[in-house]
Amino acid sequence: MELASRIERLRTGFIRTFWVANILELFERFAFYGSKAVLAVYLVEKVGLGPLGNTLVGLYGFAVFFLPILAGTVVDRYGFKKSLAACFFIFSLGYFAVGLAGLSQAQALVDSVGRVQYVVGALLLTAIGGSLIKPCIVGTVARTTDAATKSLGYSIYYTLVNLGGALGPILALQVREGLGIEYVLVMSAVVSFGNLVATLMFFDEPGGGTPAGERRTLGKVFADMVVVFGNFRFISFLVVFSGFWIMFWQIFYSLPFYVRDVLKFERFEIIETVDAWTIILITVPVTALMKKIRPIMAMTLGFAVASASWLIVASTVSIPLTVIAIAFFALGEAMQAPRFYEYVADLAPPDQVGTFMGFAFLPVAIGALVAGPLSGWLVQTYLKEGGNPGGMWVVCAVIGFVSTALMLVHDRFFRRRGDA
């Protein structure tokens, strides 16, 4: 009966705008994760930036996940349709600009600007476009669902996000092998332009907009940042938790070089998708199993499992074991991710939970910012020069285990009595 009810809600419970928004999100994830899969290798080798390329990839990741804090004010002011159109227009320009850096026909332009300056500008332009997507799509899901359909609506949204993360790198592989790595960025630009056209043609502004008096202004955002960053108990936990994301981003920043140069498997994009496919398959049963465990223990177990996965990679040079290790990492991710937001909500002052939760994704941004230069150092030191590629993954494991210990220490000293 429950299954039949869910199928009926799936068939009749959502208006067209809900489906349009989610399809746009799926194709945007194709473009984002397709480019993400090759970006480190592309900047380091094709564009010729060396280890600095890894640092810039990290800077780009930081901007993509930090700027939505500010972008929400733009969405509130101009609405979802205009913001989405601007997002995909900027994405189209940004991805294409990044792709130009690797095209022989554009080298005169790139060199006239300065190779590093050009790439930094192109990446930041792309990140500005990326900052608009999440407030628009998540906001549309919120406005086009009700109490009966909201849970299923968000489930559909997150499933499509993960599906995009799983298929994007595979599409990138086909383009890289067929045309060249620089054309992966061109592909992302074309997909983004297609999303722009689809937005203008099919996306309707959902009802229930934010009243003018309740819209967030930049002044309000910066005031909230002062409050949140001034709360040591809250912000210190986010910094500690960023250790997980430092490990996670190595799947895109360091692993491609290892898979190609050490494992001698040229199609590194396939290995990058293991995490996403595993998450799709195991999230529901793992979440059910972890539901009765206290959030701090669920996160600790998840951190420990994810950290240990890198020791599997370090232990031997093996494609099957590397695949198993990344799946093991995804298991750790699935164990802790749902409980993170529950725990962070408990850390926030009771009367300011909404404000503080708006900054809960900062660990993703901090992790990317640190993971970029760390990746450049790991690849150069252990893989290119040191002849000890396993050492890269030992360092990642140490970061994870130290973060796990610090998380327990933080919980011991800062958890309020009676908290979960």
Model regions and ranges:
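Juxtamembrane intracellular "pre-TM" segments in multi-pass secondary transporters
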Residues: E2-I15, G209-V239
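Helix-to-loop junctions at the C-terminal end of transmembrane segments
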Residues: L67-F80, R176, L281-P295, V379
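C-terminal ends and interior cores of transmembrane alpha-helices
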Residues: F89-G114, A304-V317
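Glycine-rich segments within core transmembrane alpha-helices of 12-TM secondary carriers
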Residues: S151-R176, S192, A360-G372
